[in-house]
UniProtKB/Swiss-Prot annotation:
Catalytic activity annotation: dTMP + ATP = dTDP + ADP
Source organism, top-level taxon: Bacteria
Job of this protein: Phosphorylation of dTMP to form dTDP in both de novo and salvage pathways of dTTP synthesis.
Residues reported to bind ATP: G11, P12, D13, G14, A15, G16, K17, T18
Keyword Nucleotide-binding recorded: yes
Species of origin: Streptococcus agalactiae serotype V (strain ATCC BAA-611 / 2603 V/R)
CC annotations in GO: cytosol
Official protein name in the record: Thymidylate kinase
Length: 211
């Protein structure tokens, strides 16, 4: 049995990571014999999806930033043990729409919470599991927000309502993460044409699988 592989897709709102994940999935399935599972955070399993609704509900503007962080961690733990780890044990490739880096970028850089606390909580919630590969889709915050506003398919959530400076801090947090872990995190310019982003993503994933 082939070893399972965890690949996370990360990026600020409007970067297009979910669109790219959905586009690259059939290409990978056509190319590879290994089973591929796609999932998302927060969510992926019933308990975590219910937590997702609480976190992203636009009515919950009064939510404390530490409450937000801890809800993400609870959703992460349940999702990991119920869905992700069993798939990896079965030798599957798991494509994850967000994982541990989102908490560092959003609640750390974005909300200003202590990143050392967030990293400890991430380790606690995941038993120190990290992705084998993280694809970070980088886009200027202004471009990301413009895409969100123009999208007719996307449902606006509570985080989309944040001001530009919040999104800029999140992006900076991601860039710092990418600089700190270059062997795990690969940065992709998501301001390119979509077909170029998809092709680059596909190539990077295949290269990592074939190593």
């Amino acid at each position: 049995m082939k070893k399972g592989l965890m690949i996370s897709f990360e990026g600020p709102d409007g970067a297009g990571k979910t669109t790219v994940l959905e586009a690259v999935l059939p290409l990978l399935r056509e190319k590879l014999s290994q089973d591929i599972l796609t999932t998302r955070e927060p969510g992926g399993v019933t308990i975590s999806e219910e937590i997702r609704h609480i976190i992203l509900d636009v009515k919950h503007t009064q939510m404390d930033k530490k409450t937000e962080l801890l809800l993400y961690m609870a959703a992460r733990r349940q999702h990991l043990v119920e869905k992700v780890l069993p798939a990896l044990e079965e030798g599957k490739i798991v494509l994850m729409d967000r994982f541990i880096d989102s908490s560092v970028a959003y609640q750390g850089s974005g909300r200003g919470l202590d990143k050392s606390h967030i990293k400890w909580l991430n380790d606690y919630a995941t038993d120190s599991h990290k992705p084998d590969l993280t694809l970070y889709f980088d886009v200027p915050s202004e471009v990301g927000l413009e895409r969100i506003q123009k999208s007719v398919q996307r449902e606006v959530n509570r985080l989309d309502l944040e001001q530009l400076d919040m999104h800029q801090r999140v992006r900076q947090g991601y860039l710092e993460l990418a600089d700190s872990e270059p062997n795990r995190i690969v940065t992709i310019d998501a301001s390119q044409q979509l077909d170029e982003v998809i092709a680059e993503t596909f190539s990077i994933i295949l290269d990592r699988i074939n190593q």
